Structures are given as C-alpha cells and as structure tokens.
C-alpha cells in the first residue's frame, strides 16, 4: 500500500512535493489531502504554471473542493488550525508541514491530534524527535519518531559532502558559505523586515545574511557537532544555490583523493542523493536537478595538504522536495 500523505501549505515546497511524486510516477506514495488558505482555483493555477520549473507535466483540473492530478483526486481544504484538519477521515499516514509557520515539535504535533500518524516539517524545527537528511541518517528513523524535521535545503546539500569527506580524511573544523537564490521570505522592493539585510530588494542586491545550516549538520552527524559554522549570501537568481565549504582536514590529503572519495560515494552508497560534475557548469544547469548536492570536481582546492576548499550545487527547491518525498516513504514503512 502506498504511504498516504497530506500537505499543509501549498507554496513552493508543497507544490513541488506533489510535482515530484507525479513526475517520478511514484506508486509508493500518494497525496490525499492539501490544506492551504488560498482558493482552490489559485492553488491549481500555480501548480499548472511555474515560473521556475515550467508547466506541470500533466492535466490539473478543479472539481469542487478537490484538485484532480492525473488519475487522482485530492481533497483541498482551507483550515487555519492544523489540529482540526481532516487527516483522520482521509487516512493520512504522514502529514507534510510546509507552511513555514509550525516549526517546532509542539506546534507540528497538532497534525497528530488531527489524525496523522507521523509529521515531517519542511524546515529546521525545535524539539523534534529527529532531524533527517535522507541518505545520511534516515536509517536512524524508528517507529518512535513521530515528528521529524527534513532540515533545510542547504543542510541537505552540505551533509552528504561533509559525511563523505569526514569519513575519508576527517574534518577538524569547517566553514560554509552558501550563495543562495532569493526566496519568498525576501521582498521584490525594499520593505520592513526583522532582518535588515533581508529588508532589501531581492532581485537587485547580493545580501549577506545568516544561516544555521552548517551547525545543523551536527544534528545529523553528531561527530561533527560544534565543528562547523556558516553564513549565507542571497543573490538575484530565482532558484539554484551553491555551497562553498572550507575545512581543515585531520591529515594531509590531495585534490585527487577528495574528488575520488566523492565520486565513489556518488556512484555507490549516495547515488541519487549526491551527484558530481566535471564540466564547467553554472547555476542554471542545475535547475530541476533532483540531487540534494552536485559536487563540482574542478572547484576542489587543497593548500598545504590540510586546508581544503570544495563546492557543491543544489536546486534548493526541487532537490529538497524530492527528499521530503523520500523521507515520507521511509517513515511510512515504519508505521
């Protein structure tokens, strides 16, 4: 039986989760409910037409209070409080909390009260049972994990790389900069924002700001807890981001050893999660790439044997949404 999921919040991630399931033709998971405060016709329109990822690869129609996608009919509601969502009636196994609002275990657990058996938050979340980066630590999931976080798109990019390199040469300490496309958290023109950097026009500026993505790797890989930090620079592109990661190796290494370790992992245990490229690529080449992280081989630098710099691309929307799907299936199997 497929894992039955309900999506709360049909924004960039919510829509891409549904699209990822549809595009892959997955039969191990199905969306049975969507909750979003926008009109159902608006949600259907934004699913059909996407400025970043193009048209939805299939027919999307509105039938009363439901959206028809392919052969499936998905119930759509507009309810503010997650605890009153119809997850029990819809037989929801896993609720995907994609509003960006209910980002703590206490708040996200309202989906359990509504009848969902498990909850995945599409953002870093406080107090959750586990922070999951699929491919890195999803094997730690147990039936006792009821509310988990899917981490962030940036943590999903960095963690596979950090795991491979820590296993290969050891990471004493490291610092990441993510050059990140703008998101809906930023205005198109200057306006009031609690972060004065993010108050500035997204498409007109390179914007230094904060990120907890590097530190969060320690939640996924405890052996790296306290060893990583990072910052973000938001840039005027609508999608695709890149991490620039510098670290001090625990022993002397070479560019060939670093690249070789990543290539082996990408072709074996992390296939489909970690990719690599040997071409002189730019950001648009990775739009709609389902990998969590695509390592740029020609960007690896090593100084004095132990100071290492690497770079890895990620589609911050599409890769993350695909991992939400993978994690939901993994959790569903444990119910």
Task: Show where each model-derived region lies.
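Catalytic core of tubulin tyrosine ligase-like
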Residues: 170-232, 238
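Short, solvent-exposed beta-strand edge segments and adjacent coil->beta transition regions
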Residues: 144-145, 201-203, 240-244, 307-309
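Predominant activation on well-ordered alpha-helical scaffold segments within soluble catalytic domains
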Residues: 18, 109, 159-166, 177, ...
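C-terminal active-site/capping subdomain that shapes the small-molecule cofactor and substrate pocket
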Residues: 230, 242-335
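Short, flexible turn/loop "capping" segments at secondary-structure junctions
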Residues: 140-142, 198, 235-241, 302-305
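N-terminal Rossmann-like NAD(P) cofactor-binding subdomain of oxidoreductases
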Residues: 1-199, 326, 334-335
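Glycine-rich beta-alpha junction loops
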Residues: 37-39, 125-126, 152-154, 178-185, ...
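Generic structural signal for well-ordered, non-membrane alpha-helical segments
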Residues: 10, 14, 104, 151-154, ...
């Amino acid at each position: 039986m497929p894992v039955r999921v309900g999506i709360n919040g049909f924004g960039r991630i919510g829509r891409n989760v549904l699209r990822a399931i549809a595009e892959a033709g997955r039969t191990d998971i199905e969306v049975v409910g969507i909750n979003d405060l926008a009109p159902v016709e608006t949600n259907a329109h934004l699913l059909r037409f996407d400025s970043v990822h193009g048209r939805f690869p299939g027919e999307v129609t509105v039938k009363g209070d439901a959206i028809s996608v392919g052969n499936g009919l998905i119930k759509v509601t507009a309810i503010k409080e997650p605890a009153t969502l119809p997850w029990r009636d819809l037989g929801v196994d896993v609720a995907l909390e994609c509003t960006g609002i209910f980002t703590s275990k206490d708040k996200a657990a309202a989906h359990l009260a509504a009848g969902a058996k498990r909850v995945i938050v599409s953002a870093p979340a406080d107090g959750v049972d586990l922070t999951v980066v699929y491919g890195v630590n999803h094997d730690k999931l147990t039936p006792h994990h009821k509310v988990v976080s899917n981490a962030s798109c940036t943590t999903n990019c960095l963690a596979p790389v950090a795991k491979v390199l820590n296993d290969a040469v050891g990471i004493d300490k490291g610092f990441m900069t993510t050059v990140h496309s703008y998101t809906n958290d930023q205005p198109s023109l200057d306006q009031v924002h609690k972060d004065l950097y993010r108050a500035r026009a997204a498409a007109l500026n390179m914007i230094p700001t904060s990120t907890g993505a590097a530190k969060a790797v320690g939640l996924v890989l405890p052996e790296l807890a306290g060893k990583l930090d990072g910052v973000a620079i938001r840039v005027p592109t609508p999608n695709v981001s890149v991490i620039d990661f510098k670290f001090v190796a625990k022993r002397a290494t070479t560019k060939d050893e670093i690249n070789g370790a990543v290539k082996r992992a990408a072709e074996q245990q992390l296939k489909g999660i970690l990719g690599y490229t040997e071409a002189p690529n730019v950001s648009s080449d990775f739009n709609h790439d389902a990998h969590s992280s695509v390592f740029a081989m020609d960007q690896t630098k090593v100084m004095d044997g132990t100071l290492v710099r690497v770079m890895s691309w990620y589609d911050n929307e599409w890769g993350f949404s695909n991992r939400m799907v993978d994690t939901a299936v993994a959790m569903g199997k444990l119910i």
